[in-house]
Amino acid sequence: MRAYADTGFLCSLYASDAHTNRAVARIESQRLPLAFTWLHQLELRNALRLKIFRRESTREQSTASLNAVLADVAAGILMPAAPAPFDVSTEAERLSAQWSSKLGTRALDILHVAGALVLGVDEFLTFDTRQAALARAAGLRVPRLA
């Protein structure tokens, strides 16, 4: 497993938004599996369902997106990963203490970067500038998603 995408990136991949074309292009060009943790599962599924409440998608569109996620897990595009919770928590606290006051990072963003570090991935995919700054500060490669 060499890449980790934050949930915002994954949401753009599975539900049309301003970043969808860039997310799809990146995945098609890299052909690497993406780590898919319990945090991704909860956050992505909830985000896709929340789009119904916000009237950004229909129930049918959200169901299709959820089914596409399941299909990509089965196809190995999303690779189930289980970083040790204690290790993620320890790394997250370290990142928070070192960077939150400087970068303005949020707890879920910190958890994603900590999870990526614990999993030992090579690169971190995000459209979030603060999360990208944290990932870079933590030593992860964050490609420019143009």
Name what the model sees in each region.
Residues 39-97:
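Active-site-proximal, substrate-binding regions of enzyme catalytic domains
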